[in-house]
Amino acid sequence: MATSKVLLSNVLFVFVCFGICSAARTLLTLEDRVNLHVGTVVGGYGGGGGSGGGGGGAAVELGGGGYGEGAGGGEGAGAGYGAAGGGHGGGGGNGGGGGGGADGGGYGGGAGKGGGEGYGGGGANGGGYGGGGGSGGGGGGGAGGAGSGYGGGEGSGAGGGYGGANGGGGGGNGGGGGGGSGGAHGGGAAGGGEGAGQGAGGGYGGGAAGGGGRGSGGGGGGGYGGGGARGSGYGGGGGSGEGGGHGGGYYP
């Protein structure tokens, strides 16, 4: 009788131990699954404005990073922007400005027809294209990053742009265009204002010896841009027929 009680007690003890181990293993498995899914953060993208609207918010890069597709705009819309790795900056409609990319550059948006100054965004490490002016717009210049970027754009009344840190900005084409101002080590002389007529011929800088030409015709509006260093900033857009905003913003 005593032997049966001892045997039964041992069997019950073994079952209790198995139950405790099984419960602990289940809890650990659930915790691992939760930890596997938590922390996956996806970068969003910013929206464009409506008629006369401003820019959207900033795209975010966390870990593997999201993407930075910039939104286009309607009439007078604001800018989009790109996250690290590039993407397109948002183009404006009438009078809209554009946003720049981050580490991989990207395209800065240009001003539309009737717009004022459009601010094109430059890349932090990869340069990028500056914004171009539209018909009647006071053209948007592009700011380069560590690499050179292109300056102002085309169109009647388009102005020049600022050069990058190591490269000059190109001048605008079309009537009343001004040249692009040079960068720290680059060329690109400022465009002249000697009356109306043929557009400016501002040159590409891109080095200590680089020089830009001077153009005849009225001076256009210069622009400058901002890209984020790691995340993306955004460029503000102007209203229809008005001046644009400027780039900027830093989102770590």
From Swiss-Prot:
Residues in the signal sequence: 1-30
Chain residue ranges for the region called Disordered: 231-252
The keyword Signal appears for this protein: yes
Subcellular locations according to the entry: Secreted, Cell wall
UniProt note on tissues of expression: Expressed in young hypocotyls.
Keywords for the protein's UniProt record, in alphabetical order: Cell wall, Cell wall biogenesis/degradation, Repeat, Secreted, Signal
Entry annotated with the keyword Transcription: no
Coarse class of the protein's main subcellular location: secreted
Gene Ontology BP annotations: cell wall organization
Example of a GO cellular component annotation carried by this entry: extracellular region
Role description: Responsible for plasticity of the cell wall.
Protein name, UniProt field: Glycine-rich cell wall structural protein 1.0
Organism of provenance: Phaseolus vulgaris
